[in-house]
From Swiss-Prot:
Catalytic activity: a 5'-end adenosine-5'-diphospho-5'-2'-deoxyribonucleoside-DNA + H2O = a 5'-end 5'-phospho-2'-deoxyribonucleoside-DNA + AMP + 2 H(+); a 5'-end adenosine-5'-diphospho-5'-ribonucleoside-2'-deoxyribonucleotide-DNA + H2O = a 5'-end 5'-phospho-ribonucleoside-2'-deoxyribonucleotide-DNA + AMP + 2 H(+); a 3'-end 2'-deoxyribonucleotide-3'-diphospho-5'-guanosine-DNA + H2O = a 3'-end 2'-deoxyribonucleotide 3'-phosphate-DNA + GMP + 2 H(+)
Domain notes: The histidine triad, also called HIT motif, forms part of the binding loop for the alpha-phosphate of purine mononucleotide. The HIT domain is required for enzymatic activity.
Motif Histidine triad motif location, chain numbering: 263-267
GO molecular function, one term: DNA-3'-diphospho-5'-guanosine diphosphatase
Database matches in CDD domains: aprataxin_related, FHA_APTX
Region (Interaction with DNA substrate): 198-202, 260-261
Site (Interaction with DNA substrate): S179, H256, H267, K282
Organism: Xenopus laevis (African clawed frog)
Ranges of biased composition (kind: Low complexity): 142-154
Identification of the protein by name: Aprataxin
Polar residues biased stretches: 155-164
Length: 347
């Protein structure tokens, strides 16, 4: 069974273990190093479900506890999942959860986790390259589909070394933070961002643009991030232009409303959706409904409102019928949809 850990995103202290199906209460005190008097000593009640991969959160204190910037209130228990950010009180003191494979020596594991956590800060965990901006030497395997016909022949699997590294660092939702530092995955990088191949591409061309800065989700973005987001958009368009041709399907540039990975990332994806990794309705609807926020729309929201507005219950659109993104005809199954899409491919 996996073990659940509560991790301070500020890196102020070691991880806190959340035993399966046991209630853990945290708040102001030496364990969290929170001294804010607005935070109760019993601010938040947590109960991990290591089988289902989430933590039930209940606010116990008077002042608001929130997940991804949304207050949870005193009356409800809310699911905290990998990739989400828990703010203990007043949108301060951010935490995330990780699920690690259980250790046969729990004490040694805890000591190792605390030791590694105490050395890690948000700055040194992600800003691995602060050299003068430079473009990587592009290898054909890094920037083009895996066959000469322009199609992805099979859904890629994780390399052995990467699998071991990801497992040692945490839950699959943390995988991006490993991939963005893997030279074999990188297509371009500078002092602000890195572009990587999507490990499970949903189209013939699918890249991710990520900031080195640790930003958990769209809801964390503020006006001060505008220049960074504009830079991500510009780099995404350049990558699409440089590595495709006039016969390629058009591209879209945007973000998932609620990212599956715990690091904000811009999708640069061709609209052929010709990939064996595109397997289910959730995959499809995440790129063809309002769940996919256009990059320019995000930029305009930051310019106008200083933040990104994500619709309530936006996840419901992932359950809507399968509609072709070109002609809007409904398709009964994914195989039927994928066959239908061939009619729209560039000739």
């Amino acid at each position: 069974m996996f073990e659940c850990w509560l991790v301070s995103k500020d890196g102020k202290h070691g991880r806190i273990r959340l035993p399966h199906a046991e209630t853990v209460v945290i708040g102001r005190g030496p364990e969290t190093q929170i001294t804010d008097k607005k935070c109760s000593r019993h601010q938040v009640q947590l109960m991990a479900d290591c089988n289902k991969g989430y933590v039930k959160v209940k606010q116990m204190g008077t002042n608001p506890t929130s997940i991804n910037g949304v207050d949870i209130g005193n009356e409800h228990k809310v699911e905290l999942k990998p990739g989400h950010t828990l703010y203990i009180v007043n949108n301060l003191y951010p935490y995330m959860i990780e699920f690690l494979e259980g250790s046969t020596n729990p004490r040694a594991k805890i000591e190792n986790e605390n030791r590694s956590s105490s050395k890690r800060t948000p700055e040194n965990s992600l800003n691995v390259d602060t050299e003068t901006p430079r473009k990587l030497v592009k290898k054909e395997s890094n920037v083009s589909p895996s066959s000469s016909s322009g199609r992805i022949s099979s859904c890629p699997t994780q390399g052995k070394s990467n699998v071991q590294e990801v497992k040692s660092q945490g839950h699959w939702s943390q995988d991006l933070k490993v991939s963005m530092q893997d030279p074999t995955m990188q297509v371009f990088k500078d002092d602000k961002i890195v572009v990587i191949k999507d490990k499970y591409p949903k189209a013939r061309y699918h890249w991710l643009v990520l900031p080195w800065q640790s930003i958990a989700s769209l809801k964390v973005l503020r006006a001060e991030h505008l220049e960074l987001v504009q830079h991500m958009d510009a780099v995404g368009h350049n990558i699409a232009r440089e590595h495709t041709n006039s016969k390629c399907a058009p591209f879209r540039f945007g973000y998932h409303a609620i990212p599956s990975m715990s690091h904000v990332h811009l999708h640069v994806i061709s609209q052929d959706f010709d990939s064996p990794c595109l397997k289910n309705k959730k995959h499809w609807n995440s790129f063809t409904t309002d769940y996919f926020l256009e990059s320019q729309a995000v930029i305009e929201m930051l310019k106008t409102h200083g933040k990104v507005n994500v619709k309530e219950r936006i996840s419901d659109v992932l359950k809507t019928p399968l509609l072709c993104h070109m002609c809007k005809k409904e398709q009964a199954t994914m195989p039927q949809l994928k066959e239908h899409l061939k009619k729209h491919w560039p000739t």
